A protein has these predicted regions:
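Intrinsically disordered, low-complexity, charged/polar segments
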Residues: 44-97
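Loop/turn positions that initiate beta-strands
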Residues: 6-10
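Short, surface-exposed secondary-structure edge patches
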Residues: 1-4
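Short beta-strand-centered aromatic/proline hotspots
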Residues: 18-28
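Basic/aromatic-rich interaction segments and small domains that mediate binding to polyanionic partners
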Residues: 27-52
Length: 97
């Protein structure tokens, strides 16, 4: 299993106009390949501190894509950084299965 990130991680990446946020729901192997299960938020943030505040009050985040599956190659092409880890909820686990 890939050890870069783990389920429950909040990952951010930079866009032209600020930062966007993803949540890693699960990481699994599919026939030897790594598959990443993510949710995406519609919120954009001007800086990292704003992301940290939003994660602290997770109810303020708006999920735009509840579940997307990426191959390892597609995931690696997006440069993300981990900012926090919060256990995946039972509702989030249901989305993946």
């Amino acid at each position: 299993m890939d050890n870069r990130f783990k389920a429950g991680d909040y990952l951010f990446f930079q866009l032209e106009a600020g930062f966007a946020l993803l949540r890693l729901l699960a990481v699994e192997r599919d026939e030897g390949d790594i598959v990443w299960h993510l949710s995406a938020f519609s919120d954009l943030f001007p800086d990292v501190e704003s992301i940290e505040q939003a994660i602290a009050d997770r109810n303020s985040l708006t999920v735009s894509v509840p579940h997307v599956v990426l191959t390892d190659r597609a995931f690696e092409s997006t440069q993300v950084s981990e900012i926090a880890n919060v256990s995946v909820t039972p509702e989030e686990q249901e989305i993946v299965t």
